[in-house]
Amino acid sequence: TESLSQQIRAGEIGVRPFKADCVASLDAPLTGKTAFMFSGQGSQYVGMGSDLAMAFPLAREAWDRAAGHKHTGRLRLDRLSFPPAAFDQVDFGAQTQTLTEMQHAQPAIAAVALSQLGLLSQLGLKADMAAGHSFGEIMALHLGGVMNADTALTVAAERGALMAKAAGNTKGAMLAVQTDAETIKPVLQKVGQGLVLANDNGPDQVVLSGAQEAV
C-alpha cells in the first residue's frame, strides 16, 4: 500500500494528456458505506485507462488478461483504448470512431473497469454495494460475485458483437425525452415506423431510438 501511495504522489507531478475525472485522497477513510458505480457504453474515449496502465503493473494485468482472452484477445483492446498518439484531428477522429463501435467499446470498458477494480482492491477500498448503467450492470454483477473476470469479458464481447450485428449498416441514434412513457406512446404512433421506445428510465425520462433520419 505504501508503494502504491508513493506512485500516486509521483503521478501528481507528471504531465497528463487527459483531464482526470476522479480524485484520489490519502487521508483517513470516511465512515459510512461505499458504492461503486459502473458506466455504460458512451463513456469510452481514446486514452481511457492509459494513465493507470502506465503507472501500475496491477492495472496492466487486466489488459494482459483481455489480450489473452479467447473472445477479446483478437480485438487488442489495449491498442484500441490507448493507441499511438494521433498526428492530427482526422487520425484522432478515426481512432475515436473505431473505439466507439459496439463490438470494441463494450469489452474495452470492461477492461478499464477490471483494471480499476484490481487497483482499488489492492489499495484496500471495498464496495458495500454496486450499480451499473446499461452495460455497466455487467461489471456491477462481476463485482457482486455473479461472474468472474473472464466471464465478464466474454459477456462484454458477445453483447457488443451481437448489438453491432443487429444494427448492421444502419446509422442509429438515441434521443432522451423529458416525459413519461404513457405520454410518448401516442406521439410515436403518430410519427409512424422508425422510432421505438427503447428505455423507460423513470417517470420523467424516456429514450427513443431508431435510424438517424427518424430521430
Where are these regions (language model features)?
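Conserved alpha/beta-hydrolase "nucleophile elbow" surrounding the catalytic nucleophile
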Residues: G132-S134, D200, A211
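Short amphipathic alpha-helices in soluble, non-transmembrane regions
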Residues: L4-Q7, L188-V191, V215
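Short beta-strand segments
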Residues: M37-S39, Q178, A198-N201, S209
